[in-house]
């Protein structure tokens, strides 16, 4: 029996050649849990570079009031 390695997810930002942006808060909501926490790389499928940049942009959107800090 041959066991194949699972296919790697391709980072959507690398694929589309763009960067995460705090002004696109509707898209950033996809990377938050129901409680408002930032999802990890395994769940988002992003590369390390874009995961770090995504976290910075989510925090920036929170400071501007575009995203909630905590969802109750």
Swiss-Prot record:
<keyword id="KW-0699">rRNA-binding</keyword>
<comment type="similarity">
    <text>Belongs to the bacterial ribosomal protein bS18 family.</text>
</comment>
<keyword id="KW-0689">Ribosomal protein</keyword>
<dbReference type="GO" id="GO:0070181">
    <property type="term" value="F:small ribosomal subunit rRNA binding"/>
</dbReference>
<comment type="subunit">
    <text>Part of the 30S ribosomal subunit. Forms a tight heterodimer with protein bS6.</text>
</comment>
<dbReference type="GO" id="GO:0022627">
    <property type="term" value="C:cytosolic small ribosomal subunit"/>
</dbReference>
<keyword id="KW-0687">Ribonucleoprotein</keyword>
<dbReference type="Pfam" id="PF01084">
    <property type="entry name" value="Ribosomal_S18"/>
</dbReference>
<dbReference type="InterPro" id="IPR001648">
    <property type="entry name" value="Ribosomal_bS18"/>
</dbReference>
<dbReference type="GO" id="GO:0003735">
    <property type="term" value="F:structural constituent of ribosome"/>
</dbReference>
<keyword id="KW-0694">RNA-binding</keyword>
<dbReference type="InterPro" id="IPR036870">
    <property type="entry name" value="Ribosomal_bS18_sf"/>
</dbReference>
<protein>
    <recommendedName>
        <fullName>Small ribosomal subunit protein bS18</fullName>
    </recommendedName>
</protein>
<dbReference type="GO" id="GO:0006412">
    <property type="term" value="P:translation"/>
</dbReference>
<comment type="function">
    <text>Binds as a heterodimer with protein bS6 to the central domain of the 16S rRNA, where it helps stabilize the platform of the 30S subunit.</text>
</comment>
């Amino acid at each position: 029996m041959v066991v194949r390695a699972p296919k790697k997810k391709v980072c959507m930002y690398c694929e589309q050649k763009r960067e995460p942006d705090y002004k696109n808060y509707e898209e950033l909501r996809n990377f938050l849990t129901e409680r408002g926490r930032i999802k990890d790389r395994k769940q988002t499928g992003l590369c390390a570079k874009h995961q770090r940049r995504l976290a910075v942009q989510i925090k920036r959107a929170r400071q501007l009031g575009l995203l909630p800090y905590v969802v109750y």
